[in-house]
Amino acid sequence: MSNDSSECSQKLPKLKRILLKLSGESLSADQGFGINVESAQPIINQIKTLTNFGVELALVVGGGNILRGGRANFGNKIRRATADSMGMIATMINALALRDMLISEGVDAEVFSAKGVDGLLKVASAHEFNQELAKGRVLIFAGGTGNPFVTTDTTASLRAVEIGADALLKATTVNGVYDKDPNKYSDAKRFDKVTFSEVVSKELNVMDLGAFTQCRDFGIPIYVFDLTQPNALVDAVLDSKYGTWVTLD
């Protein structure tokens, strides 16, 4: 898709309300750790474009650029539950950064967290979400589900259900779902579209199994796409050239 905003403006979004799942690493770029504001700016710009189109948008961001929680190598010195709690705090840091970057571009945004922090983070309250989204406010969900032993994919599926999302968009560095690992096999085949049943029968890798099952059970399509492509987030809503749709049977 062209970066020309005039071309974008001639198209109408296919989705009205979406849940975008971002990895923490998408904020760190090549440095691999922390937050790189300049590298994150294209994401902010695309979110602004979508809100200008009238798309209602909520985000779930991971914390892997700061700490990967249960995947961190702490040996037996730090319990898994504690490591996961540390990972939840990392998502809060990222969410606050995203909020301020959006506000700096004139985009109204608010953070809701599974665990509140007085004077800093509001506790997530599902009955508020519809009102906030209808105002055109971008919601950023932090703190995971508030429970250890689950991934931010699960947070994304849960929040997608709570807000009644038309789709869950999972931003990755791979342009969709393949029949096998494209990083290992040069003959790997990419799917433009695949059903939930086919994902199960072919044992394809889409996202955390619990999150995948929740989306299937509540009828929420999943779009897996390569965020590193030019204007990929806007394309996900307008054209869907850079990824794979997982849909109901």
UniProtKB/Swiss-Prot annotation:
Q: Does the keyword Cell division apply?
A: no
CDD domains (alphabetical): AAK_UMPK-PyrH-Ec
- Compartments, as annotated in UniProt: Cytoplasm
Keywords from the UniProt entry: ATP-binding, Cytoplasm, Kinase, Nucleotide-binding, Pyrimidine biosynthesis, Transferase
Q: Which Pfam families match?
A: AA_kinase
Q: Which domain of life is it from?
A: Bacteria
Alphabetized InterPro entries for the sequence: AceGlu_kinase-like_sf, Asp/Glu/Uridylate_kinase, Uridylate_kinase, Uridylate_kinase_bac
Q: Which GO BP terms apply?
A: 'de novo' CTP biosynthetic process; UDP biosynthetic process
State the Gene3D superfamilies in the record: Acetylglutamate kinase-like
What's the family?
Belongs to the UMP kinase family.
Q: What is this protein called?
A: Uridylate kinase
Organism source for this protein?
Answer: Francisella tularensis subsp. tularensis (strain SCHU S4 / Schu 4)
Q: Taxonomic classification, please?
A: Bacteria, Pseudomonadati, Pseudomonadota, Gammaproteobacteria, Thiotrichales
